[in-house]
Structures are given as C-alpha cells and as structure tokens.
C-alpha cells in the first residue's frame, strides 16, 4: 500500500512558500509530522495514518500552507482516538503560522505600525505610536523575553479561535503569532513599565490567567477600548432621551462592548403624552429600535455580534408584552428576538407570588421613583401607590409568575436578578440605587443618566494551581490574583472610553471584575466529584483567596494612589466586607482581621473586584471548561471546513486510556448515551462520579455552591440553571431556592436538553388537525387541550410553592 502511495505522490508537486515547485514525498510529510510528536503518547498517535489521509486529499499544485492546514484538520479529526491528536493538530497549525509570520516581536510591531491599507493605499497604523516607540526602545529585551514554544501549548480549537478573531491581520493576512498578541496585550496595559509587562506576558503565556476578549482585541491599538461591560440607564423618558440612549448603545457596541440597559423609567403603553396630546406606544416599539441597532452595529467591526440585555422591573405595566418579545411565534411587530431580556425583581414580588397575593402593574410616569429605591423604601412607596389607586391594573402575582416561567421554558430568557440582594450586598450602595446588571448578569454597578457603568474583566485558570501531588496552591493563586487586580486597575486609566459618561463613572468608582475558568478541570485533577464535600470546600476557599488577594492588592494600590473617589460611606470603608453582608464566616485560610486593619488605614483603590463571567471564548482558547460550570457533556461535535467530528472530554479519555477501557466500542457507548457515562457499568463508580455532567448534578447543589462562593463575590456571577426536562414546578422551586439562598443572580440562562428523539408531526387530512407525537406524549392542537395543559402547568407551579423543599428535592 505504501508503495502505491509513493507512486501517487511522485506525480504530485507542491508550491513552496517561496514559489518553487517540489515533488510531494510521502516520507517528507511523515517526517515533518513526526518531528511535532515530541512528548506525545506514540502508542496512540500514528503520523503515517495522517500522512495517508493527507495524500488522499492532495491535488497537483497544492501549496505547502494548504498541505499543513489539511494535515492539521485530519489530526484534529482523530482527537476522539486520543487527546494528543488535538495537540498535534495545533502544533502543525502553529508551525504553519510560524512559517508565515516574522519571528521578532519588534519587527512584527513595526509592520503593524507601518500598515498600508491596500484598497486606499493609505497608511493606517494598527498599533499606536506611543506603544510603537515603547517597543522600539525596548526591542532587545522584549524580543528575548518571548518564548515561542509556548504557542505549541494551545489545542487545535483554541488556536483556531485565536486565528479567527484575535490575532491582528494586515490586509486579511494574519501578522501576529499568539505570543506576539500576548506581549502586545502586556505592553498595551503597562506601557513603559517593562518589568510589569514581562511579568504579565509570562503569566498570560503560561496560561495562569487571561484578559477578556476586548482587551485581547484592542490592547496597544489606536483606540484601546479594553472594557467588556457597559451598564446604562435611559437618559430620559422622552424622544430625545430615548434616541440619546440609542446613540450611546451604538457607540458602545461599535467599540466591542456588551450592554445592559434598564428601561424601568419608560412610560407604559396607553399613558398620555402631554407635549403631543397623544398616548405612548410603550416599550415594545422602542425595543424593536434597539433590536435593529444591535443587529446593525456589531462589536468591533464583525468580531462579535452586537449584544444588548434589557432590564425591567416586574411592576411595569408592559411586563407581559416584554415577556413575549423573544418568543418564536407571534406577530413580528411584537417581537425583538435579537435582544436579551432580564427581570430586576424586588423581594416584594417574590413574597406576593409565594403568598398567592395580588400584584399591581404600574406606569413609571404615574407612579414615579419606584426604580430609584429598594428594600423597605421600595415596599412603602409601592404599597402607597396601590392604596392611592394609581395602578394601571391588578393581576394575581402567580399569573405573572406563570408567564415568566412560560417564557423561560420557551426561550431561556428572561434572566432573573434579585434587585434587593444586588443593592443590599453592594459596596456601591452609598452611591445610589443599582438599577440593572450587564449582558451576562455578573456585573452589578451603579448607573445613572449621567454615568454609564463600565467593567474591565479577566479570568484566572483554576486548573493551573493544582500541584502534581493533587493539592491546591492557594498561595500562588493569591499572587496571580494580585497581579490581575493591578492590571485591571491600570486598564481603567489607559482605556479608551467611547463616551464621556463611561469615563466619568469608571474613574469615580474604579470597579474591576475578576472571574475564573477551569473549575471543573481543577476538580477532576484533584479527583473531587462536583457534589462532594471536598469540592464544596475547595469552591469556597478558592473564592476566599481571590477576594482576599484582590482586596489586598487594591489596598496596596490605595497606599500609593489613594482610595477611589466615592470610597467614603461605602460598606468597605466601615469595615464591612462581602461575607459580612451574607452573615458568613470564612475558613481560617487567610487573616481577615489583618486585612481589615490595613483597609481601615489606607482604604481600597477599587469599589468592586470579583465577578465570575461566562468565559465562553477565552476558555476555548485556553482549553478549559467555562467558568465554574460543570461539564455539560463528555463528548461533543466540532465543525471544521473538512466536516464534523466527535471530541471527547480529554480528562476522561486519558483516564479511560490508563484503565485500558478506551476503544471504538466505548466511544460509541458514550455517543449513544449523549455524552453521559453513568450507565456504562464497565467504568469504575469513582470515575463515573468524577465525570457527572451538569444534567446529572442536582440543581440544589449548584445553587448551594453559588451561595457559598457568593459570600466572597462583591459583584455577582453568571449562574446558569441546567434542567434536562423543565416543568413549571421544578423551575418555581429552583427560583425560590436561589432567592432564599441570597443569590444576586438567580438565573442567567435556563439551559435545557433537546428531546432524545425528534418530535414527529402528523396531519389528519380529514379534519385538518395537527398533532405532535413525541417523548412527552401527545398534545393535540385543540383549545381544550391547550387549557388542560396550562392548568396542569399551573398546578405544578402552585404545588412547588406549597411544598417548597420537598419539591426541590424530588424535582431537581
């Protein structure tokens, strides 16, 4: 067979990078792949297999670059045989990029600075003159500090994500290597402080942490908009105010920012407008305008689609229409499906639902000030308006709750955030009432018509602190956290702000957001099942360490730069830290009294510090599982240009390989079990416990973990709820459990599992009736059946409210 392949290759030629033609040689391709197999398990990785498939895909005149791309994709497609194939695929792709790009960082930076747009023939620098001069002045040290072999540490999918969106391009051709990008980010943050830049570069390149996507996109460029999150309050309930907010959202989205916008103050449908003697159209037509802005103005010129989350308090008269906006069916003029929706829920609403009480829907024009107060003040004002008969209408609180659950089951929205918890446990409560969160529900900051809240983010890779002895290095975690805190604080000062209101807010309050990724990976490396006591303790102590390290770093900054402007009167200025607001006692890992004494003397430089975000893109780049999430599956599909293939959880694959259990039959069993290994008896129980997916972990335990770490999170957390088959009772129990646990974010997305078997539609031609036959039985399309179904769902919901803990245990 190899002889035949040699005959075939002798008739083919490739075009080299310098334009020369050369015959294709089987042995030469194999040798190139073989050289990249260092430290891989050669019992499973076979370079000849890849070469054979490469030869089959060749044509006469193929370029060496195309040949490398093909070899990389073929290796990636073999990942389900062994995870080392993903490493090999990345090495082939990285090696290819290295051949296409210059080596010296200073040379690459010079090319980026002298970039000429070939369409206009004008010089358009891709990096700033200031940073170009810094690099030029320190070229020798910066060039020698870069370790290019670290590029080979990425897996294939992480590297391809970098290529697609993060590495700077010149006229469509990638100009940077990953190490160049990381040094650009370090120089972009630290400027002339070369020691700090090299320190940051090393931690980034060793993958201890990563800055957020906008920072990776724009550091050291002419417009370094490095912030991820912006929180806006409508400037006014008027045409002028609304369209000023539209413009603000467009400018932020243009600069790659995600948006959280609260619309509590906009008058409800049918309310009179004195200036025109007409009536208001309410929220829906206005939100359709924002929907179109989000579609048109994407984040950073095509890097990511524009993304706006709209926040509303549930007393607003248009709340029922608001809940319909993302649904798949219904009139187009009543839908705005490209926005995301969130409820900013006061405790009073939850109490009324629980007691099956009435709920009054109000217009902010007729009942002003409700969104400006929280807690007892809100309840007094709301009940005063009720007594004065100012409500537009009154409904049963449970009927609105039912509509909320119905929308969540269909669309995964609205997000659920608890207004009073967000304000009661905020270090910014002295500034004013917090009116909304951000796009991803982890940022909780004060915003006002003249202040747009901003947050700069970074996430720490928790798996990096597991030692070879399977202990956790909290000391190193604290050290890295302090560096991350100081980096994020520096970004506040060097950042390009798309709007003056954003600059004003960020310089006054100086909040930052430190998150995490790879928590599930860390647990697997420690051999702790997700629901174990050991995992619970590690979860808490990790966040104790991050909060402690961030506060310590912020206090050190305050010693030299002073506290942030609005520090006086804040809970921290009174010696009250986040865990005090939760009535929680930390473990004895750190000396909190010593820290409180330092803060009492010097203050802190930043009002807020910790905010675990989703980390979708950066976790993929780093090869980690997202945030604090458990794995959603142990096998999943990846799509590349050459087709689809299965990828297995690399930790599981290594464990099964070591147990001599990995083969095609095992792979097929996992695929047929939809990524679960719980029913595969040949796998030892301890291994099965370690690899439970999020669908096999009780929601109650994930909420408890969220509350345990929440006591050390001074912002909030992007907390998803995963329910394989949601019903109204389960969701009601979950929301009430998270509310009573004290969470600020009760739910980011509701994640559900698609039915195992596709639903089959049948049509009765005689009667013209449509029926759905699926896993959950048959639901005929008659009004009677619809009513019966609705009554059953309502009964589930009421049952869960009446039985609470019993429902929580059995249902989740």
Curated annotation (Swiss-Prot):
Domain ATP-cone as annotated: residue spans: 12-103
Binding site for GDP: 213, 228, 438, 442, 615-618
Keyword Flavoprotein assigned: no
Activity regulation statement: Under complex allosteric control mediated by deoxynucleoside triphosphates and ATP binding to separate specificity and activation sites on the M1 subunit. The type of nucleotide bound at the specificity site determines substrate preference. It seems probable that ATP makes the enzyme reduce CDP and UDP, dGTP favors ADP reduction and dTTP favors GDP reduction. Stimulated by ATP and inhibited by dATP binding to the activity site.
Gene Ontology BP term (one): tissue regeneration
Disulfides per UniProt: 229-455
Modified residues (Phosphotyrosine): 786
Active site: 438 (proton acceptor), 440 (cysteine radical intermediate), 442 (proton acceptor)
Site (Important for electron transfer): 748-749
UniProt modified residues of type Phosphothreonine: 778
Sites bearing Phosphoserine, chain numbering: 782
Residues annotated to bind dTTP: 237-239, 254, 267, 274-275
Keywords, ordered alphabetically: Allosteric enzyme, ATP-binding, Deoxyribonucleotide synthesis, Disulfide bond, Nucleotide-binding, Oxidoreductase, Phosphoprotein
Keyword Repeat appears in the UniProt entry: no
InterPro entries assigned: ATP-cone_dom, NrdE_NrdA_C, RNR_lg_C, RNR_lsu_N, RNR_R1-su_N, Rrm1
Sites annotated Important for hydrogen atom transfer: 229, 455
Site (Interacts with thioredoxin/glutaredoxin): 807, 810
Subunit structure and binding partners: Heterodimer of a large and a small subunit.
Described purpose of this protein according to its UniProt entry: Provides the precursors necessary for DNA synthesis. Catalyzes the biosynthesis of deoxyribonucleotides from the corresponding ribonucleotides.
Name of the protein in question: Ribonucleoside-diphosphate reductase large subunit
Gene name as annotated: RnrL
